[in-house]
Amino acid sequence: MHQSKEERVHRVFEKISAHYDRMNSVISFRRHLKWREDVMRRMNVQKGKRALDVCCGTADWAIALAEAVGPEGEVYGLDFSENMLKVGEQKVKARGLGNVKLIHGNAMQLPFPDNSFDYVTIGFGLRNVPDYMTVLKEMHRVTKPGGMTVCLETSQPTLFGFRQLYYFYFRFIMPLFGKLLAKSYEEYSWLQESAREFPGRDELAEMFREAGFVDVEVKPYTFGVAAMHLGYKR
């Protein structure tokens, strides 16, 4: 039976939720932590503000945002995988954070009014949605005027030689890690497919502009295997 992209992605994340954090560290050689630290530094999140992390998964970025805005601020994390949210809830509870709420929802139809958040983020989630532009426009809609939306995502390396090595690693090695460490070869095969098909830096920057963002900034990481895109709402 043919599955839609949304159905397939949901099945993938429901299955790998218990191993997701560990596998992220293995696959990226823990570089994803440094990438997000740099993005947070560039965002310069202010105390008392409101933030939304779309496709929050196990809530790492939502937690970082909650710590940054402080107890006077408010953070929502949204994901469509109940199992990923359960892992995230455990992490939020362990840190004693009372200013972050994790909710089950769909990035294609964010359950928030227009102009709700000072910061809207999505980390390693945009490549998994059915329609990139729909989600970017939804993120733009709920961002306050003057606020920012930030995407941290895999990208397409441009350095010759390294690009070929990257594609080999993602296509053949990463699924093996999934099989050995998480018993999930098929699921990690999907993740490499979604990364391979995702737009490059320039194309995604143009999509940000088409969605309504201005002053779009792009920062590549580790020879372009990942990139930050940051845009503001007028």
From Swiss-Prot:
Coiled coil: none annotated. Its EC number is 2.1.1.163. It catalyses: a 2-demethylmenaquinol + S-adenosyl-L-methionine = a menaquinol + S-adenosyl-L-homocysteine + H(+). GO terms for molecular function: demethylmenaquinone methyltransferase activity. Belongs to the class I-like SAM-binding methyltransferase superfamily. MenG/UbiE family. Pfam families: Ubie_methyltran. Methyltransferase required for the conversion of demethylmenaquinol (DMKH2) to menaquinol (MKH2). Keywords: Menaquinone biosynthesis, Methyltransferase, S-adenosyl-L-methionine, Transferase. Gene3D superfamilies: Vaccinia Virus protein VP39. This is Demethylmenaquinone methyltransferase. CDD domains: AdoMet_MTases. One of its GO terms (biological process) is menaquinone biosynthetic process. PANTHER family: 2-METHOXY-6-POLYPRENYL-1,4-BENZOQUINOL METHYLASE, MITOCHONDRIAL, METHYLTRANSFERASE. It comes from Geobacillus kaustophilus (strain HTA426). Pathway: Quinol/quinone metabolism; menaquinone biosynthesis; menaquinol from 1,4-dihydroxy-2-naphthoate: step 2/2. S-adenosyl-L-methionine binds at residues 58, 79, 106-107.
